[in-house]
Each structure stands twice: as C-alpha cells, then as structure tokens.
Amino acid sequence: MTKFLIIRFSSIGDIIQCMGIIGGIRERFADVEIHWITRKDMVGTLSMDGRIDKIWAFDKETGLAGLLKMAADLRKEHFDYIYDAHSNIRSNILKLIVSPLPFVKPYVALRSKERGKRFLLFKLGINHFDKPFRGMVSFQKPLKKWGITHFPDNYHDWCFPDEIRSKYENFVTKDMVTLVPSANWEMKRWPVSYWKELVALLPEYRFVILAGPKDTFCEEIRSAAPERVVNLAGQTSLM
C-alpha cells in the first residue's frame, strides 16, 4: 500500500483548491492511504471528504514543541510520498524530520509560492502570473513528476454532518448560487461592481453570500437585487 501525506495548514480557499488533487492521487495509485496535516480549525472542512483516510490537526497554540511531537508521530507512519502544498516554516520543519534525506523515500514534492511574482503583484501592482490564473492548477503541477497528471472532478459523496443537512436542506435550492467574495488580500478580491453585474446577468438565480463579519462590502452586493440575494456575512462558520 502507498502512503501519501499532504501538508496544507490553511487557509480555507487554498485548502479547497488543494482538495482537487485527491482524485488524481487515488487514480494514480490503486491502493493508497491519504493523510493530510492541517490547522486545527480547518479539520471540519477536510472531514467532509471521505477520500482522506486520516486528518492530522495541528494546534498552533502548542507552538514548536507541538509541531516537533507531531513530526515525530508522522515519521512513524513511513510515508512513501510527501507533498508540501504550503511551503512555510512549519512545513519545512516537518519535512526536515519526516524526510531528512533526499532521493530516498519518502519522496517530496513542493508547491512553489512564486514569491517574486507575488511581491511584484501585491506591492507594485505588476502581474506576471498566468492569465487567467487558476490556483487549483498551481496545486496540481508539482505532482506531475510522480505521474499524477489527471485530476477527476466528479466526486459528490460529501460527508456533511446530520445537523448541517437538517438545518439547510430546505434553504438550499437548485437555482441557488453561493458567492464567496472576500479574501485576506484586497488585491485578490473581485471588484464589488463585478459581483453586482454577475447578479444582474443571472436574473433566474438566487444568491447567498458567505463571508466574514468584517466584510461589510457584501451588503452592497446584496443591494443589486435584495429580493434574490441573501447576505450571510459573519453569520456562518467553516462547518
């Protein structure tokens, strides 16, 4: 059996895009056990995907000591492949302990953050990323060296908790579209005028907006069609 570890601690948008690689891993390896290490508050999102065999929850309150203990436990799993989809100090510490030697198992792949391009875009407004930029593709590219090149997107067996299903089963309809207009970096956000135009272009659909309590601009999006747009900014959680 092949054992595969994915490292991605946060944030919600990146984790959801990274989840797109799971189908490709399972297609490439007939008998595979997939583990994922993430931040404690992201476990609820990943737990909805039944294709992940084990989720490791890192509590950042435990600091370096907690990370080192988790690294020691991960090393005992004897992984064949490790995919560092985060590339930060924490993930580098994990790799150093779990996979200390190059060119031997566990083999390691790294997703580049393309820091030079990020600096130019976020600080100087100069965009050298692919146009259009697709974050999901950036998570897929590093896996090509392992022969993982096809990523099925037909998974529908999401494991929503019963209380979530019962709470929203009458709220969600086939003509509903969910909008998630926020981002930590303002430059990553689509302009509000574009969201309002999208709502206007689809008069046959209802919309629900999901965002954080500080995203007050969502109310302006709702104003495009108050009878069809529900603003739940600040009223929901990750699970």
Label every model-predicted segment.
Residues 1-239:
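Catalytic machinery of carbohydrate-active enzymes
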